[in-house]
Amino acid sequence: MTSVTDHSAHSMERAAEHTINIHTTAGKLAELHKRTEEALHPVGAAAFEKVHAKGKFTARERIYALLDDDSFVELDALARHRSTNFGLGENRPVGDGVVTGYGTIDGRDVCIFSQDVTVFGGSLGEVYGEKIVKVQELAIKTGRPLIGINDGAGARIQEGVVSLGLYSRIFRNNILASGVIPQISLIMGAAAGGHVYSPALTDFVVMVDQTSQMFITGPDVIKTVTGEDVTMEELGGAHTHMAKSGTAHYVASGEQDAFDWVRDVLSYLPSNNFTDAPRYSKPVPHGSIEDNLTAKDLELDTLIPDSPNQPYDMHEVVTRLLDEEEFLEVQAGYATNIVVGLGRIDDRPVGIVANQPIQFAGCLDINASEKAARFVRVCDCFNIPIVMLVDVPGFLPGTEQEYDGIIRRGAKLLFAYGEATVPKITVITRKAYGGAYCVMGSKNMGCDVNLAWPTAQIAVMGASGAVGFVYRKELAQAAKNGANVDELRLQLQQEYEDTLVNPYIAAERGYVDAVIPPSHTRGYIATALHLLERKIAHLPPKKHGNIPL
């Protein structure tokens, strides 16, 4: 029930409005102030209180939390929808449900939009879509990263097909901007229908644990059509899209954590494809590689186990190679048999792609191949050198992998790496067998500098499998003669390992540029990055390659 006090307040507001004389300069300024204030609270303060009660920020608060203080410049703050159907003519909130503009992050210009779930549930209508299209085009034209903060419920049904038309324009702009400017999407609530395709077209997708959901069709529709019972979190929650679908690149513990991750990832990225990622003028070491060895470098000399079948954590290698041991891992919970992420070596941003021996022995499978391929393409788009750390016994065997398309989908990594023109450096730490050796940054796939540790095992296959092929007849004859076949097999395996399973055969043929002590790895990579800083590489003229999608 509305109180007498509420009626009095409303009457006073109406009286104040009537006292503004818009025919004077002072009145015009007062009118602007009134409209600007209305844009800040388009549906009233109570709606914001409901958002806060859920532990979430409002659309504007999210922008302020992400950007540098006092840097946000809003665009189209006074826009309103033009629809009159279904009573919308009487309900025209200022801003139409999305806040757009530009500002700075660490002093670098970015364009941004933030969807307002308090206005029509964050649903996209014509003017809402036009605002996003406008800021997308501004980002492309000025060569600035674009950040989208998503919290909306799909198309605005009351506005009909124009909503779908604007979705299509947004998607097309995402595609035109791809590889030109970094595009980052944050999912801060339940995003459904058309709201999920734009984030899927961007470079990085950040979700918030227990807060974010993404799906094309919701649980109710799925229940009706298929009979399946599934919750929103199970269907499209942050961990679902990290561990199962691979759509999410980072799962944040809260909204501020999500904003911090975006600021971090931007620090490794250039503003556009014609510029380089930021550098922070770190002093360059003088003297030889040996002169600059640290205790962390020396730890690498004892990291690889004596047994080739004993795993180790590749993160232990990665962090020791990077400045300040800082590694921004991407998709850490997806396809964990491969590790990808960003770091710096001598202040130069690099992309790391590394097999993970503690998961599937580091084997490549479908998901790992696609995860690595996408990351390689992101690095190539934005002029970030690629460093591969290789310990791979092969592709994961099994009928499931074969039926699901490991041939075609594994070839995506081959294609992505072969097409990349950025500096490419490979370090083989241990196993590099068969076709997986070729895929993981081999010299003949176009790698610029190939290094190997003395523990490297570069061969068509491991000793156990090879002996079964090469000495099949000898083993069969030994069995017939009653000899100790197991003892003979071990002897032949040792002979094979001593002869072929090492880095030196590849080094003799130039497939490895240098066999180095593990402790020298960071120094060798740093000098290679310096050498390749102005690398010139050209692909044959073409419209585009036909990657095996």
Swiss-Prot record:
Q: Would you tell me the Gene Ontology cellular component terms?
A: acetyl-CoA carboxylase complex
Keyword check for Transferase: yes
The record's section on Pfam families has: Carboxyl_trans
User: Which UniProt keyword terms apply here?
Assistant: Transferase
| Enzyme Commission number(s) of this protein | 2.1.3.15, 2.1.3.-
Q: What class of enzyme is it?
A: transferase
Bilayer-spanning residue ranges: none
Tell me the GO molecular function terms. propionyl-CoA carboxylase activity; transferase activity
Alphabetical list of InterPro entries matching this protein: AccD/PCCB, AcCoA_carboxyl_beta, ClpP/crotonase-like_dom_sf, COA_CT_C, COA_CT_N
Q: Where is the CoA carboxyltransferase N-terminal domain?
A: 25-281
What interactions and quaternary structure are annotated? The biotin-dependent acyl-CoA carboxylase complex is composed of AccA3, which contains the biotin carboxylase (BC) and biotin carboxyl carrier protein (BCCP) domains, and AccD5, which contains the carboxyl transferase (CT) domain.
Its family? Belongs to the AccD/PCCB family.
The protein, known as: Biotin-dependent acetyl-/propionyl-coenzyme A carboxylase beta5 subunit
